[in-house]
Amino acid sequence: MEARLDAVADAFEAGDFEAALAGAEGLLADAPELPEALHFRASALVELGRLEEAGKAFGQALKVAPEDLEILLSAADCLVCRAGEDREAVAEGLALCARGRRLAQKADDVEMLYEFLLLEGMGLNQMGECATALVSLDAALGHMPRSLDAQVERGIALFELCRFDEAKAAFEKVLKDAPDDPWAHHYLGLIAERRGDEKEAKRRFDKARALVPEEFPPPVELAEAEFDRAVEDAVKSLPRHAKQYLDNVTIAVEDLPSDEDLLGQDPPLSPSILGVFRGTPVGERSVMNAYELPASIVLYQRNLERFARTREELIEQIGITVMHEVGHLMGLDEDDLWQRGLD
């Protein structure tokens, strides 16, 4: 049995995930509750992109070995890092992180505690809970002070919280130890862009793109008139029940969100937001309140162009963003919009 497990491990390490899966399933035919084989099976399914099957496989593994730190970490990583924009999956992964963190503390396993704290910080950043993410990431760095992964993720949290000077210092610190870290260059480009340093922003973006072109494709750029036309088409395509709310609502396009827009809420809005609704939702307005500002919707062209990978995707996202902000105008919150697929 040990030799067969070693063969599965060798296949997995060599990147032959089909062979690793076949070997793990062969082991499970003889020993259905062998934790190591269950773990290899689930992990191989992840690497093969069969995520739904992987989720079930991790469930089986955790049923057999509910306190196995390695299985818990792999299952949490699958949910946090591989599930894309699935907030429910990320939330489930965060629950596994909390469980693993407690078990690692109990076992005095510093390395695994660090891993769970780092993954927790990543998941919290994805959920937009960046202040809480900072707590986890600072704790992770308390155990592994030189961790570049934790430093980068901490810089991202600071950026999302609009603490731009601190984020800049964090990413510059990363580059001292890892001059070719693409995410540090990318975020330093975003920070330079916000302060109007176009030359520095371009240099940073070009560097990040050269390092990992698949992560940072060139933005899909539209001329001003073409972008405005796409916005007009998006408004025309709105359902009739939504259009009725747009009387006396200004729809505008700006390059990037201002500090005023971002810091007008607590916690602040993400600097990467695609659009924003300014004003009071229709259901909350009062004819007695003379101080209510006129309602407006703003789309942020550079963020939208960076978000999309093709012209078609950009046009589609403009439509989704317009509908999203009209949803806020109608009084829907982020959870309502997420349930409607408009997040």
Language-model segment annotations:
Residues S272-G319, L329-D343:
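Active-site scaffold of zinc-dependent metalloenzymes
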Residues M1-E36, F40-E47, S74-A91, L119-Q126:
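Alpha-helical segment of the N-proximal tetratricopeptide repeat
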Residues A11, G23, L38-L45, A57, ...:
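TPR/Sel1-like alpha-solenoid repeat signature
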Residues D30, V64, L103-A107, H143, ...:
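Structural marker of alpha-solenoid helical repeat scaffolds
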Residues G26-L27, Q60-A61, R99-G100, A139-A140, ...:
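Canonical positions in the second alpha-helix
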